């Protein structure tokens, strides 16, 4: 029987599939951070349980850490308690921890892949909604709740219902300057923020195959923003080249065996999907969101939509509400929208490729007057590589702030927040009301678009001189 990539990985991980019950699947890798793990560890303590396989759990500090200082003194009392609790729990239960002083510390969805913790064909979970990032490697990766975190710790399994399958094919090749972020925003714009609900999405097509692993991670990272359970991309030579030699990747004979096994991790030619979506890559322009969800997105050369032109009353009301919150007028050309904050970072766009793309637009220029722009590498390894390439100097000379790794301004949980009324060009993944701070306005863009906005003081079409 022909199978999709998702079905192959799913079937290989079923432990028990009793009739009339949700199957129990095995979990290969469990990633944890300081925010969603304390209650889970506490639950184990109360029940007197040990972890089933502590060597398969990896922990880092990222959500509530400071990006200006590696000192605990720089943290709020709540954040300090969270990181200290994680440190204590990891020590007690024997979990490998990348704390704020570790050279490999970083955002969990950046750190995991770059260390080779993320591998094709595995099931990966984390108490974080953007766990789908790891699907870029052909893994089945999805976010779980805190009670499920405890369950995985105790049993290394989860009870899960099988999802429907969706194929999203991006045919042909994108124009120069069009990035993975533009591709995934265009996809979300086409199917909407709930178009993938109930599905595991497989991204494919020439435009997807041409992406680097960094780009593929950006695409899968935002699968959740279209409502999908997970996003996956079949592993190939690009995947193997990225993983080869990384700390937790297979070595020696095991590597050759892994390569052979990974070659089978692709949807069969005659496999059927429950839904199929097709985009033409050549139609994709630089994208940016105008409203309060990732599906409210347009191309840079387009206008803020007019709710009066929308025939669906529910959609019309949503547009009106979003326009009121973001304080934009219908019909405004997006290149006329000014910004006063820029955030380059997050688990969506804080890898070395992202920083290189942003640096191209920062080099030899200056951040516009009245604009504050920060660059936050996704991990210690990304920061180290960027500094070896001199990217930090490019940003600093242009007036950007160069920070320590962490989730930072993606969410209003740490000290990196926007003020009410701020308008931010952000490379993150969510532009919900208050996501970056109460009353803040977020426009999701690629790293190149964010850096260009920083120096121009407004959004620009990076395909043209500015």
From Swiss-Prot:
Family: Belongs to the aconitase/IPM isomerase family. LeuC type 1 subfamily.
Binding-site residues, [4Fe-4S] cluster: 347, 407, 410
Phylogenetic classification of the source organism: Bacteria, Pseudomonadati, Pseudomonadota, Gammaproteobacteria, Alteromonadales
HAMAP family: LeuC_type1
PANTHER family: 3-ISOPROPYLMALATE DEHYDRATASE, HOMOACONITASE, MITOCHONDRIAL-RELATED
Pathway: Amino-acid biosynthesis; L-leucine biosynthesis; L-leucine from 3-methyl-2-oxobutanoate: step 2/4
The protein, known as: 3-isopropylmalate dehydratase large subunit
Any one GO MF annotation of this record: 4 iron, 4 sulfur cluster binding
Job description of the protein: Catalyzes the isomerization between 2-isopropylmalate and 3-isopropylmalate, via the formation of 2-isopropylmaleate.
Natural source organism: Shewanella piezotolerans (strain WP3 / JCM 13877)
């Amino acid at each position: 029987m022909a199978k999709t990539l998702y079905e192959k990985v799913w079937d290989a991980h079923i432990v028990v599939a009793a009739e009339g019950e949700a199957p129990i699947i095995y979990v290969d890798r469990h990633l944890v951070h300081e925010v969603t793990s304390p209650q889970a560890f506490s639950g184990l303590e109360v029940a007197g349980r040990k972890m089933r396989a502590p060597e398969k759990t990896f922990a880092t500090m990222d959500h509530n850490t400071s990006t200006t200082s590696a000192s605990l003194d720089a943290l709020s009392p709540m954040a300090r308690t969270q990181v200290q609790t994680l440190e204590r729990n990891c020590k007690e239960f024997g979990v490998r921890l990348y704390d704020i002083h570790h050279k490999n510390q970083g955002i969990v969805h950046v750190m995991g892949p770059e260390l080779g913790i993320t591998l094709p064909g595995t099931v990966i979970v984390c108490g974080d909604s953007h766990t789908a990032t790891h699907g870029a490697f052909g893994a089945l990766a999805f976010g779980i709740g805190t009670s499920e975190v405890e369950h995985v710790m105790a049993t290394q399994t989860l009870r899960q219902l099988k999802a429907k399958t969706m194929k999203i094919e991006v045919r042909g090749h994108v124009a120069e300057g069009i990035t993975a972020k533009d591709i995934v925003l265009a996809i979300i714009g086409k199917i909407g923020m709930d178009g993938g609900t109930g599905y595991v999405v497989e991204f494919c097509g020439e435009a997807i195959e041409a992406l680097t692993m960094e780009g593929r991670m950006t695409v899968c990272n935002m699968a959740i923003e279209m409502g999908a359970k997970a996003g996956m991309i079949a592993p190939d030579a690009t995947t193997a080249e990225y993983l080869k030699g990384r700390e937790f990747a297979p070595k020696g004979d095991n590597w050759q065996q892994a390569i052979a096994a990974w070659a089978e991790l692709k949807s069969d030619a005659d496999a059927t999907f429950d839904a199929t979506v097709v985009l033409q890559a050549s139609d994709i322009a630089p994208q940016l969101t105008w409203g309060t969800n990732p599906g409210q997105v347009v191309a840079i050369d387009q206008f803020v939509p007019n709710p009066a032109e929308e025939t669906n009353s529910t959609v019309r009301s949503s547009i009106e509400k979003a326009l009121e919150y973001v304080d934009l007028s219908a019909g405004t050309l997006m290149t006329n929208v000014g910004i006063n904050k820029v955030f380059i970072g997050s688990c969506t766009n804080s890898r070395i490729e992202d920083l290189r793309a942003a640096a191209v637009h920062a080099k030899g220029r200056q951040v516009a007057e009245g604009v504050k722009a920060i660059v936050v590498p996704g991990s210690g390894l990304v920061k180290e590589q960027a500094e070896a390439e001199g990217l930090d100097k490019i940003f600093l000379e242009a007036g950007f702030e160069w920070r320590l790794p962490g989730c930072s301004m993606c969410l209003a949980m740490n000290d990196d927040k926007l003020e009410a009324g701020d308008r931010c060009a952000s490379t993150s993944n969510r532009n919900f009301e208050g996501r970056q701070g109460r009353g803040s306005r977020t426009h999701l863009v690629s790293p190149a678009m964010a850096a260009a906005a920083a120096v121009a003081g407004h959004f620009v079409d990076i395909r043209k001189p500015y």
